[in-house]
């Protein structure tokens, strides 16, 4: 069988492809997050939604489940399932929104606040260790923000 040279001519090595490198970095970062969150009995998705609720509550009030999903960049159905699991763990409160029987307002229980603070410290320490290995870790947030704020067509979708 002859090698497929044409499709691979753009990069000298797979490790020169930004997508391939990002994939591997994401795998390693995900493993670091799982290790940091395991002692707190939280999955990464649970942590992200718990933290999003915390951020939005701090910004002013009880966010809707939709607002939390949007903030986290998560699917609304998946958010609903995960929020119910956080509620079952005693970390989150859910109350029907006034005037809309389909909408839920979310908050953190005292245990949820405490768990979030502990988990956030662990995640931030893991982030410092992981991203600190980069040549210029201070530039990473702006680079990642520029990429994360674009939709599939390349348009900027968030501030």
Spell out what each predicted region is.
Residues 1-40, 89, 138, 159:
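N-terminal leader segment of winged-helix/HTH proteins
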Residues 18-37, 116-151:
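Hydrophobic alpha-helical core bundles mediating ligand binding, dimerization, or RNAP-core interactions
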Residues 27-75:
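N-terminal helix-turn-helix DNA-binding core of bacterial DNA-binding proteins
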Residues 51, 60-74, 99-101, 116-119, ...:
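Short, structured secondary-structure boundary patches
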Residues 60, 149-159:
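Short, charged, intrinsically disordered terminal tails
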Residues 65, 83-84:
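Short, hydrophobic-biased segments on the C-terminal half of alpha helices
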Residues 84-142:
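Charged, amphipathic alpha-helical coiled-coil/dimerization segments
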